[in-house]
């Protein structure tokens, strides 16, 4: 197959699910080059083969850089026995994405728009605050710089609405004491690659912007002491619904098709904006018991829910390393006529093993 003309190979690759690309890239350097070619993704788009690709970001104690992985099919294509769960593997794995010098990041700084993953302001935990903005091209897996924020933020969060990135954060002004914190709200247009020329006023908002936000019903919801929401069409700030933020004590939440989902103590819930209350996600037969929500991450996976969680790896003896197993499940979501949500577990698998000393930064999806 490697002796075929490049044009023919591109045509073949464009018709193959991207889940198999990490394996194909191992065949040869020419394959790796073709799989990163812009022409390949143009062909995929013309064929209507654009798909959602799951990316997962970790930080290990071995250095300041983040490490990236993407969901794919196992290279050998076989189903292996997994005795820890008394089941056979479904053939999925998180493959390493070779990205050199990947900048620090945290949950609230990472968002995806199309095939680009944006790192807004870096990580406030792994180094000094930053105003830098970096973009990871998930086609070539190369970072490039974007226009920076106006100031370095102490805490911040970013969410996407209509291909624009809404960033809310706080920064120290003046002498830098605790009473000098101010809020900042900016909007980045991903089409023009420029920030809104005049930052949107947020002086009337009460409380400092925290590091959690979500875009629901065309509005940018930001967690503060009381919670606020920005209605961009009206250009004003309003007080948020208290119950929407009351359930999100951690980062185990995501927005899927304009619905906010959350897991707390092993129970999945979704937010009903009409009733202004959290409701239980029904179904989920076959899903194993999950750990505390601080060890769980959720992501929109093409309208389905990707659930990733950590679990202690069985001891390998006195000389064994302390490691954690990363599991992944994909759940199809369906809304019934009575407005209840049901989840159907399509598969779950042990997809990665990582050092015990790590930070599970985030899982998110790019469209390719």
UniProtKB/Swiss-Prot annotation:
PROSITE patterns: FBOX. Kelch repeats lie at residues 116-163, 165-218, 260-304. Residues 1-44 form the F-box domain. SMART domains: FBOX (SM00256). Signal peptide: none annotated. InterPro entries: F-box-like_dom_sf (IPR036047), F-box/kelch-repeat_ARATH (IPR050354), F-box_dom (IPR001810), Kelch-typ_b-propeller (IPR015915). The keyword Repeat applies. Keywords: Kelch repeat, Repeat. This is F-box/kelch-repeat protein At5g51250.
